[in-house]
Regions:
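Thiotemplate assembly-line natural product biosynthesis machinery
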Residues: 1-22, 75-83
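Phosphopantetheine carrier-protein modules
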Residues: 16-36, 53-66, 81-83
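Catalytic nucleophile serine of serine hydrolases
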Residues: 39
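Conserved catalytic core of two-component sensor histidine kinases
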Residues: 43
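Short, cationic-aromatic polyanion-contact patches
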Residues: 68-75
């Protein structure tokens, strides 16, 4: 799970928080409710995650409650990956 989290973190940092340290974006940092990601940015993250990890996320997985922190996103990815 660590690699999944780090890949997601690096994408968000490079795309939406250029110049920020990875120390400032923890696994439990709220992404949407804090304003780091707006709804369009969240869709971009969904697209990235689906392409990067070869998973299909549905609306349940991508609701604000379930797609608001890096750890939430990583959990959804791991749950959707083939065993």
């Amino acid at each position: 799970m660590k690699d999944v989290k780090e890949t997601i973190r690096q994408y968000i940092l490079s795309t939406y928080l250029p110049g920020e340290s990875s120390d400032n974006l923890r696994d439990d940092t709220p992404l949407q409710t804090s304003g780091i990601l707006d709804s369009l940015a969240a869709l971009s993250v969904v697209s990235f995650v689906q392409q990067e990890f070869g998973v299909e996320l549905d609306t349940y997985d991508t609701s604000v409650e379930r797609f608001n922190r890096i750890e939430d996103i990583a959990t959804a990815v791991i749950r959707k990956q083939p065993q």
